Amino acid sequence: MSAARTLRVPGRHGYAAEFSPYLPGRLACAAAQHYGIAGCGTLIILDQNQSGLQIFRSFDWSDGLFDVTWSEDNEHVLVTCSGDGSLQLWDTAKATGPLQVYKEHTQEVYSVDWSQTRGEQLVVSGSWDQTVKVWDPTVGNSLCTFRGHESVIYSTIWSPHIPGCFASASGDQTLRIWDVKTAGVRIVIPAHQTEILSCDWCKYNENLVVTGAVDCSLRGWDLRNVRQPVFELLGHTYAIRRVKFSPFHASVLASCSYDFTVRFWNFSKPDPLLETVEHHTEFTCGLDLSLQSPTEVADCSWDETIKIYDPVCLTVPG
């Protein structure tokens, strides 16, 4: 692996990282003081250049920030979510506070995602109050609230293929698929026998969703037949915090964990573990794969660092 470009952010513990879909080399990171247990949060916007990683702008919030998503409509706009139950809409072109704050959830909001399909600009949020909400960012209140999960919601993510469809993962051990048009749940999958902390949609198969859980396993689900997973990936030694499918390779995905590692997998291979990256000294919570470069990965950790790097398995053919 090439040497990671590293930015140290003293006193801030990283929870989520996401590459800009517009600007090559721009990354957003949601972070919190005191491991998110108390204190404030910071949204860090950084750029990479020949000299490394540099902070372009940072925004503080009065509570920990747990997730971040870029607008699919405006290269300067993004949304974060917080421990105080609110979402914040930011404009990186302005060095001021949020343009708008959306406050309806009654407990921590752990997940936020901006829709990727053309023709709709919607944000989905998942909370410890056991609800999912869908928002039009131009409107101050949510469009609809989805109930059904029986524990905290850790992950909510739009389908990149099907308009108005999103997945959610929860401490109630289920993966659920929802439809905004019917304002209801389409599929309930008892995906693990432990809390599920993350899920993601395959970019090349509209029926494939992956889950990552406290049981250290990743499982792939074909939504046409959910009786058993189509693959299971084992190797992490502590809970899997986040999982992301590759935007460039149909069967490649990455996961990060409380075991401090990031692992890369190809679920179509007999030996699916491609590479294990061990460059953090604390829980690794944030992870993203670049939409612009097939080899570039970003992560962030509770060790107060953000890293961008090119794992060997993505730089060599096969």
Curated annotation (Swiss-Prot):
Highest taxon of the lineage: Eukaryota
Subcellular location: Cytoplasm, Cytosol; Peroxisome matrix
Phenotype for residue 199 to S: Does not affect peroxisomal import of proteins containing a C-terminal PTS2-type peroxisomal targeting signal
Coiled-coil spans in chain: none
GO molecular function per UniProt: enzyme binding; peroxisome matrix targeting signal-2 binding; protein homodimerization activity
CDD domains cross-referenced by the UniProt entry: WD40 (cd00200)
Family assignment from sequence similarity: Belongs to the WD repeat peroxin-7 family.
Purpose: Receptor required for the peroxisomal import of proteins containing a C-terminal PTS2-type peroxisomal targeting signal. Specifically binds to cargo proteins containing a PTS2 peroxisomal targeting signal in the cytosol. Cargo protein-binding triggers interaction with PEX5 and formation of a ternary complex composed of PEX5 and PEX7 along with PTS2-containing cargo proteins, which is tranlocated into peroxisomes by passing through the PEX13-PEX14 docking complex.
Name this protein carries in UniProt: Peroxisomal targeting signal 2 receptor
Gene: PEX7
